[in-house]
Amino acid sequence: GIDHIGISSNDQNTPTGKCLVLVTPDAARTMCSTLGISEHLSEKDINFEYLQKSKVFYIEGYMVTSDSNFNSVTKSLDSLEGFGTKKALSLSNDGIVHGFREKFEKILSYRIDFVFGNHDEALALTKTDNIDDAIEVLKEKDFTTIITDGPNGSFIITDGDAIKSNGFEVEAIDTNGAGDMFAGAFMHAMLMGKELHECGVFANLAASKIVQTFGPRLKKEEYQDLSENL
């Protein structure tokens, strides 16, 4: 399970966000979302003391679409100056990267440690049109980039080098949640002290499990079985 610390409810009137996910027979998905209260996060909602004790601060790229949310992100990053918290950013969507490039560049200026994105998001971030060129651009960055590429596996670009982790051949029925599962598994393995290439292999395995089921979550016993691979 998950230990929840410092979570509070400050607004009982604004509705929660909702997301309708449509999955086609080829396992692709599209979403129709209303963000609700999730686009109104403010710094008064954040317990900076708890944040500064965290091992990882994970930022969703979608946070750039709301001025309130973006301000909360930058205030949080400001508060982490001098603390040992690792900072990770998910690019979330290639259209978001294209549309809010200046805000992404602002976040990246805070010495982000890890950037997660898929093939299309990596091309958007680097302004390239193929994955090889994107990797070459990312080799010059001072953050570690992890690029997912569906059944082809993933790339870890760090310190001027690119590490390829092969994917697992499975029959996908729903890709909803695969990127989040990958990032969560990668960071979990990292916090367990695993090497980067081991984190990539474990994250590929976790993502291969979630695409074989409908919905973005596994059952409790499936998570337990998965953790035995670490």
Question: Which sequence ranges carry the predicted segments?
Answer:
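Short loop/turn motifs at secondary-structure junctions
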Residues: 1-3, 53, 111, 141, ...
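Conserved N-terminal subdomain of the carbohydrate kinase-like
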Residues: 1-59, 226-230
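Short hydrophobic/aromatic-enriched beta-strand-loop microsegments
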Residues: 4-6, 112-113, 163-166
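Short, acidic/turn-prone active-site loops that include or flank metal/cofactor-
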Residues: 9, 35-38, 93, 120, ...
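A short acidic, often aromatic-flanked loop/helix-cap motif at beta-alpha or helix-coil junctions
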Residues: 11-15, 96, 124, 170-172
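Alpha-helix termination/capping residues and helix-transition junctions
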Residues: 48-51, 109, 139, 193
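Conserved beta-alpha-beta core of the PfkB/ribokinase-like small-molecule kinase fold
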Residues: 56-136, 143, 152-154
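Conserved phosphate-binding/catalytic region of the ribokinase-like
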Residues: 78-79, 101-102, 127-230
